[in-house]
Amino acid sequence: MTQKKESFFWTSYSDLMTSLFFVMLVLFILVIVLLHKRMEATETQLLEIKRVEQSTKDLSRDYFQYRPDYKKYVLTIQVRYPAGKSDLKDMITTDKDAQLRQLAAAGCEIRDFLKNHNENQYILIIEGQASKDNFLYNYELSYQRALGLMRFWIEDSNITFGNNCEILISGSGDGKLDTHSMRETSNEKENQRFLIHILHKNIFEHNENK
């Protein structure tokens, strides 16, 4: 009788361990499959980011210079303002009409880029900067300058940037608050400029849906 009980115990124990082994095996396989899918998704995302970064190089070097250290474009058209001014009409230049034509051409360049890549959704950020001086409101001023450029493109130059683009206006001031914004140290006046960010919106949506 005792021998039968022991035999039944070991048989049940063996069945239990076998079941646990198969459960652990299934879980192990499931984890491997999930990790493989995650790796594939990450690789696809990296390829997408590289493709987008490459596509933004379509922007003309006549008007834009890409800075890989900050991953931003600098609008190469030199714009100089009197202290405290944000209107493009107040620019300090020897040929204001030529300067405005160049700015309009730069806006058209962005418009054409967005049109040529209309299968994607983008965030376009126009960032204004200011040089350090005695003016107390350079952060507000840099925003107003970026807003002035956007209005010039849309209202004065009749440039439409399409439905695949969300436009944001920002100002990073004169660097007094040490926000680690992109700054030039050799010539402070060089910080009176516009920075252009073109971000691929699809990438952010892909991350949210994962």
Regions from the PLM with identified roles:
Residues T44-Y63, P68-K71:
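PAS/LOV and related PAS-like sensory modules
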Residues E127-H200:
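Periplasmic OmpA-like peptidoglycan-binding domain that tethers envelope proteins to the cell wall
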Residues D69-I77, G84, N120-Y122, C165, ...:
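Envelope-exposed proteins and targeting segments
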Residues M1-E53:
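Short terminal targeting/anchoring segments
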Residues T44-L47, A98-R101, Q144, G148:
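A general alpha-helical scaffold signature found inside nucleotide-binding enzyme cores
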Residues S86-L88, N138, M182, N209-K210:
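Short coil/turn segments at secondary-structure boundaries
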Residues D87-I125, I154, I196, F204, ...:
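Periplasmic peptidoglycan-binding/anchoring modules of Gram-negative envelope and division proteins
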Residues Y66-A106, D133-L136:
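Short, solvent-exposed beta-strand/turn patches at coil↔beta or beta↔helix junctions
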